Swiss-Prot record:
Protein name per the record: UPF0303 protein Bcep18194_A4700
Record-linked SUPFAM superfamilies: GlcG-like
One Pfam entry name: HbpS-like
Assigned protein family: Belongs to the UPF0303 family.
PANTHER family listed in its UniProt record: PTHR28255, UPF0303 PROTEIN YBR137W
Top-level taxon in the UniProt lineage: Bacteria
Amino acid sequence: MDIAHDLQSIGAQEQALVFPHFDPARAWALGNRMHALATSRGHAIAIDIVTFGQPLFYAALAGATPDNADWVRRKRNVVAHFRRSSYAIGLRMQQAGATLADKHGLPIAEYSPHGGSFPLTVAGAGVIGSITASGLPQRADHEFVVEALCAELGHDYAVLALARS
């Protein structure tokens, strides 16, 4: 895995995966798309879609645990704080040889810079929330969310996917 290349690719994902508008009905449709995709693959994950301050969709699939819900919360907090994907922030910390606690004073009990939470961005408004998955390895959590967003927004996932490691 090439961290610099992944960070560049994640930046392209974040720029491309922007909704023209977003409302609770769109959150429900996206959440159900993610649920169906995860179910078809046998993923034991938790899925969470929020605008900052308001939950819009949550599902814990068979095999997901309360620990997944806590990972969702902590990853979501990273997106809320930095307005970037949790995986990008984690890779930046890895690149710098630092932690969120060291560099930003953010406690590990509340913030997790692991892959799986992606900014929910609306054209003309910016980042308004997050879409999060937890239960797979962090890179797979991140890519699961990106794949679902590509399908929802009509983008070719093969073009935006991270390079295979």
